[in-house]
């Protein structure tokens, strides 16, 4: 709820993807959505600020990316995020797709080996280097977003013209651009520190220091946003 508060008062009708260790994709509603399709889609209606409802799906997200990078670091490959992104960008697209929520990745002590085994067992091309594995991870995360996005669109019977991508993932330009491409939707990325900033906004509002009408101005003055349009 805190993270969503950083964007929920921007009057665009856009949907929100909170992109961190976990992903939370959804929209702000006036009340809970209680349809059979929402139930079958494993949606949650969570209280949001100002008596609104977050209608969302939760999923494992950047944990696999961070764990992959950490394990490579343990092996002596000290890639920065930018370096790993460059390797992923240079690798061929569409090598393979994994399910980043699968137990074999959540419990893996060797993400690279687990990706190779998954690809081999599913009859897909096996990555031969770090760049290919990195691309598979990012493309698979984006595919997960796309599936969630399309399910949300089916339930809402509408699609937004804008997706707010907030949280740590907003710092990854490759992930943001590929998300815009896959969803065929403009992505507004940032703030990266949405949870902390949103919490501060809510506390200040509770103390009467600001109103919800001030949230957008505070966020705009505190954080720059990047816009990604579909290629």
Stretches with model-predicted labels:
Residues 200:
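Catalytic-core signal marking the mid-to-C-terminal active-site face
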């Amino acid at each position: 709820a805190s993270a969503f508060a950083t964007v929920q008062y921007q009057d665009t009708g856009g949907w929100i993807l909170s992109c961190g260790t976990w992903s939370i994709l959804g929209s702000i509603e006036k009340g809970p959505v209680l349809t059979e399709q929402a139930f079958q889609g494993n949606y949650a209606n969570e209280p949001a600020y100002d008596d609104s409802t977050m209608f969302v799906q939760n999923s494992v997200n950047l944990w696999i990316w961070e764990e992959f990078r950490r394990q490579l670091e343990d092996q002596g490959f000290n890639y920065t995020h930018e370096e790993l992104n460059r390797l992923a960008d240079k690798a061929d697209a569409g090598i393979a797709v994994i399910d980043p929520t699968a137990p074999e990745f959540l419990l893996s002590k060797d993400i690279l080996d687990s990706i190779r085994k998954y690809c081999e067992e599913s009859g897909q091309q096996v990555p031969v280097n770090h760049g290919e594995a990195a691309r598979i991870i990012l493309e698979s995360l984006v595919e997960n977003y796309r599936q969630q996005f399309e399910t949300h669109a089916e339930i809402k019977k509408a699609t937004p013209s804008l997706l707010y991508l907030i949280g740590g993932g907003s710092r990854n330009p490759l992930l943001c651009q590929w998300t815009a491409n896959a969803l065929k939707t403009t992505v507004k990325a940032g703030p990266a520190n949405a949870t902390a900033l949103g919490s501060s906004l809510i506390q200040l509002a509770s103390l009467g220091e600001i109103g919800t009408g001030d949230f957008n101005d505070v966020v705009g003055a505190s954080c720059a946003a990047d816009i990604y349009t579909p290629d």
